[in-house]
Amino acid sequence: MSLQALYDVPAPAKLNLFLHVTGRRDDGYHLLQSVFALIDWADTLHFERRLDGRLVRHDLAAALPEDDLCLRAARLLQRESACPLGADISIDKDVPWGAGLGGGSSDAASTLLALNRLWGLHWSRERLLALGLQLGADVPFFVGGHNAWVEGIGERLTPIELAPRWWAVLKPAVAVPTVAIFGSPLLVRNTAAATISDFSANAVEFGHNDLQTPAMAYSDEVVQALALLQSRYGASRMSGSGSAVFAEAGTGESPTVAMMEAASLPPSWVGRMCRGLTVHPLALWAG
């Protein structure tokens, strides 16, 4: 019997444990090295199959942008597979926008994985990865299913094992425009290439985030958030192009130092204690 619906489909966020800009291609895309680490801060998606071929998103929150990545993913898979089916899609959004946590990219990846199953397409992970790259540089990582060493513009993924850790993640109210950060004169674009063995020797303290200095110049709130975590956990770093920042909070069954209370944070800031994931919760949804 074919599936009629898929409910409570997770779309986990990620942290960039480091992010080095190692060059720039002739087409303007920046070349990166990073480790993407999955965390249990996640959106939740729901899908119901439609027979009329329509793709409809039913969110009661803010109006959806025309280029909504989730719908773009659904349309792309529908077109490339020539599938006559459609879907009603809704998202319980928990991962904040403009955070550098990959929330939108993860939603798109979970959409590809879910509709591949709901529509009975049986596409391989490799085919879905190729679609994901058309949607954005971070999407293939979430389709891939594992923590990864990431190179190129985000398309070269090497699965790696990461020790289970707790991460304190703090999202200030500001949204940092990615275009402004990559266009900043403060951005270093020639960081020396590293190796996985370099990272593995000291996974928590290795490297830096080349986007952090431009983001700090753009927003005092990023500076404040980094300082707040550093005072509590001893070190802090920004994820992606921001504005979320994070710090290691222990490796045991519970965090070594708890997350600060929401009442102690500036207005509209969001703090979350997150557990690192060893694999994506949908890792078995594609071959």
Curated annotation (Swiss-Prot):
UniProt-listed Enzyme Commission number(s): 2.7.1.148
Nucleotide-binding keyword on record: yes
Protein name: 4-diphosphocytidyl-2-C-methyl-D-erythritol kinase
Lineage: Bacteria, Pseudomonadati, Pseudomonadota, Betaproteobacteria, Burkholderiales
Gene Ontology terms, MF aspect: 4-(cytidine 5'-diphospho)-2-C-methyl-D-erythritol kinase activity; ATP binding
PANTHER family to which the protein is assigned, alphabetical: 4-DIPHOSPHOCYTIDYL-2-C-METHYL-D-ERYTHRITOL KINASE, CHLOROPLASTIC (PTHR43527:SF2)
Active site positions: 14, 138
GO biological process: isopentenyl diphosphate biosynthetic process, methylerythritol 4-phosphate pathway; terpenoid biosynthetic process
